[in-house]
């Protein structure tokens, strides 16, 4: 009987503790890091629209913000291996007899032997790079809707330029989707209209 009443008291205490505590909106915080710039703050500068578009193009050619080692777009793989066009070329050419890489960087020989799996670091790097590129394009398109531009007071020539930038971002996204479909078959289709998260 004592054991039974002890369990009831313990259960009652736990239920009370869980129901009386709350986060008090602790998760609804703005980052305090001075290096983090939120979209609302970034796009207050009219030049930022063109700069972000330039980053979308640069995503095809560079692997991060700083060069060979530092601030990569994608972590978990050497920045030299995570560059979009390099990975795309490897997947398209090294898997044929058109190109041969005679050294054994990581799982690169698997390309020659036609023995690759999703755990291959190069396959994963290209998949992640394509997802990153599509996500970046979607973020730009999400931040340049008519409603957001109107709310920021964007008018005139800048508004016209941004409409052109949006078309370019859509093209870059379509290019990445075409690569994804060619290389991976079925691929998740996400646009700027889809909510962030799951």
Report the location of each language-model feature.
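Short, glycine/acidic-rich hinge or "gate" loops at secondary-structure transitions
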Residues: 68-74, 150-155, 187-190
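Terminal processing/anchoring signals of secreted or surface-associated proteins
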Residues: 1, 23-25, 56, 137, ...
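Long, intrinsically disordered, low-complexity segments
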Residues: 3, 23-24, 82, 100, ...
């Amino acid at each position: 009987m004592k054991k039974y009443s002890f369990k009831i008291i313990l259960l009652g205490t736990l239920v009370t503790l869980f129901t009386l505590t709350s986060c008090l909106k602790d998760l609804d915080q703005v980052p305090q890091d001075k290096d983090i710039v939120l979209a609302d703050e970034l796009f207050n500068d009219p030049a930022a629209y063109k700069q972000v578009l330039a980053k979308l193009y640069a995503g095809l050619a560079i692997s991060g913000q700083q060069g060979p080692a530092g601030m990569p777009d994608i972590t978990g793989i050497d920045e030299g291996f995570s560059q979009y066009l390099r990975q795309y070329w490897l997947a398209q050419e090294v898997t044929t007899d058109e190109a041969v890489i005679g050294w054994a960087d990581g799982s690169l020989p698997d390309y020659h032997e036609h023995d690759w799996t999703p755990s291959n670091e190069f396959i994963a790097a290209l998949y992640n790079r394509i997802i990153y590129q599509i996500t970046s394009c979607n973020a730009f398109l999400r931040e340049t809707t008519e409603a957001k531009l109107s709310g920021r007071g964007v008018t005139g020539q800048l508004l016209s330029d941004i409409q052109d930038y949006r078309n370019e971002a859509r093209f870059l996204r379509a290019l990445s989707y075409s690569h994804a479909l060619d290389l991976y078959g079925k691929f998740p289709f996400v646009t700027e209209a889809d909510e962030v998260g799951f």
